[in-house]
Amino acid sequence: MNLWKIFFAIFVLFSPTITYSHSMEKIQNTYVLVHGMTGGGWDWKLIDNLLSQDGHEVYRPTLTGLGERMHLTHADIDLTTHIKDIVNLIKFEQLDNIVLVGHSYGGMVITGVMNELPEKIQHAFFLDAMVPDHGMSALDVAGKYINFTTKNGLVYPPWLNSKLSIPRDIPHPAKTLTEKVNFDDKVAKKISATYINFTPETLIKRERSINSSWQRAEKRGWEIKTLDSDHNAQRSNPEALKKLLVTF
């Protein structure tokens, strides 16, 4: 009995210290990374590794019909399908206080997610991404820059190369580019966001003058950053991109 009393006294004595130490641990973030057109969750593997090493929780889902889910592709996959992919991930994994990241076409998807689950998102990153207003489609945002061969409900951009080994970019469901997105929720419009443009430093001035997504982000008062990179910095310059994703 005496030994038990001694143990209990020691426990009580040191409990405040233990509790205090735990409270001082840095709270990390939960990232949901949404890939772009023709890509997949595999696109984020390098970024995932870098963020995870720092203790962040990372989800990198693949949108229906793409990547390792290419066997599910069909002509009726639309933007709503892809938005639901992410909405359901958030609901079923019971995620909260999310850092939502969208690359390229993924900007259309995360815009729809922001509109449906604004209370779940602490910050959004648009990485060289489409920034639509309410009622705009990807075609409306990109205009003349999307003029691809279409066959059996799929688009075939010029960067596809079937000779490359897997993982690789694959044909993309065409309806995802023509469906208009909803972005009319008042809370969604107040979510803090950062727009990061991937472009060589020598072309920044020109890019800002012609890029309507950049201009819409600026008009909304979002933070604007640039990264000297090609369009797929998550593949070609992951270390630099990761540094930007943890600063907001």
Where are these regions (language model features)?
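Conserved alpha/beta-hydrolase
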Residues: 51-71
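Active-site glycine-rich loops that stabilize anionic/oxyanionic intermediates
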Residues: 36-40, 104
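Conserved acidic catalytic loop of the alpha/beta-hydrolase fold
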Residues: 83-98
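Residue in the alpha/beta-hydrolase core beta-strand immediately N-terminal to the catalytic nucleophile
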Residues: 62, 99, 122-125
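Flexible "cap/lid" loop of the alpha/beta hydrolase fold
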Residues: 75, 115, 120-121, 125-157, ...
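Conserved loop-alpha-helix segment in the C-terminal half of the alpha/beta-hydrolase fold
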Residues: 200-228, 235, 248
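Active-site nucleophile elbow and catalytic-triad environment of alpha/beta-hydrolase enzymes
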Residues: 167-186, 208-209
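Gly/Ala-rich beta-loop-alpha elbow adjacent to hydrolase catalytic centers
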Residues: 101-102, 106, 110
